[in-house]
């Protein structure tokens, strides 16, 4: 049988299948067309950066449940006092094994303090284009990250990605560490695969597991010093540990790329577009 005939037969079989399904459920076959397909942006569960001692990433219990966190026994929950004084129980991670599905380019926004009135949370613009406008007293630099957390056996700890906003010191610390980590992963991959070293796109980098320890470090000047969440150390790849830091097997990366394709566009939900203030 030629490829042309095979293609014709497949089309006929698909048409028969659609007609059978349409007849069974009594709806018009035309409603099964792909022209009705449209990506929908899900509202993702979120986590919080804890700038304290100890420092780390905190996923409130309600959001951990939304994310499908597998281990939710009372003993796995920690009570944290949030910046506003409110106490909340959830998953508190001072060390992580995580993959980054995507991120938003760093941007400047006004802080969320009540004194700023209507300007609270208003976005000024991208940091790269507007860094000269940054007023550290009233503004902050932020970025959103879409994360999946894994255990030491590279099994996912939850089913849905979690969105976390990193700001200021916590953001710069993460960015610096990730730059070194991804470069090392790309170099090590090239050496093992005996190919030319090259930077990789976000889809490939989403298979790299960032294994890191957080630490609360006091930053600032004089009496304004406060604890900030910084990456204290992270694992660099070697020929011996590369397999533990890279989800290269098909059964592993298929789940990650499915999450990537379904959720990366949802990062834009974290940006309050209706209040954007773009300055030139």
Give residue ranges: language-model regions.
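OB-fold ssDNA-binding interfaces and closely related basic DNA-contact patches used
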Residues: 2-161, 222-225, 238, 279-280
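Polar/charged alpha-helical tracts
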Residues: 23, 30, 176, 180-191, ...
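Amphipathic alpha-helical interaction segments
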Residues: 77-78, 180, 265
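Extended serine/threonine-enriched, polar tracts that run as long, contiguous segments within proteins
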Residues: 143-237
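Accessory, usually C-terminal, subdomains that scaffold auxiliary metal cofactors
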Residues: 200-204, 213-278
């Amino acid at each position: 049988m030629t490829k042309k005939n095979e293609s014709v037969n497949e089309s006929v079989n698909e048409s028969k299948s659609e007609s059978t399904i349409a007849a069974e459920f009594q709806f018009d076959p035309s409603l099964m067309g792909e022209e009705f397909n449209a990506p929908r942006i899900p509202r993702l569960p979120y986590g919080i950066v804890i700038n304290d001692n100890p420092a780390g990433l905190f996923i409130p219990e309600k959001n951990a449940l939304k994310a499908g966190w597998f281990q939710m026994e009372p003993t796995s929950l920690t009570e944290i006092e949030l910046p506003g004084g409110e106490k909340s129980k959830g998953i508190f991670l001072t060390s992580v094994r995580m993959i980054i599905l995507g991120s938003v380019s760093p941007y400047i926004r006004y802080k969320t303090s009540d004194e700023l009135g209507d300007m609270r949370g208003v976005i000024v613009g991208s940091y790269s284009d507007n860094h000269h406008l940054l007023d550290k007293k009233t503004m902050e630099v932020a970025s959103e990250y879409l994360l999946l957390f894994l255990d030491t056996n590279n099994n996912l700890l939850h089913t849905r990605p979690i969105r976390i906003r990193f700001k200021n010191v916590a953001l710069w610390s993460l960015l610096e560490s990730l730059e070194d980590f991804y470069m090392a992963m790309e170099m090590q991959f090239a050496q093992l695969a005996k190919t030319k070293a090259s930077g990789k796109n976000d889809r490939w980098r989403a298979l790299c597991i960032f294994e890191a320890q957080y630490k609360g470090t006091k930053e600032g000047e004089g009496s304004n010093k406060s604890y900030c969440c910084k990456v204290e150390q992270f694992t660099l790849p070697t020929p011996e540990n590369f397999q533990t830091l890279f989800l290269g097997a098909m059964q592993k990366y298929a789940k990650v790329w499915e999450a990537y394709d379904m959720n990366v566009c949802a990062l834009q939900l974290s940006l309050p577009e209706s209040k954007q203030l773009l300055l030139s």
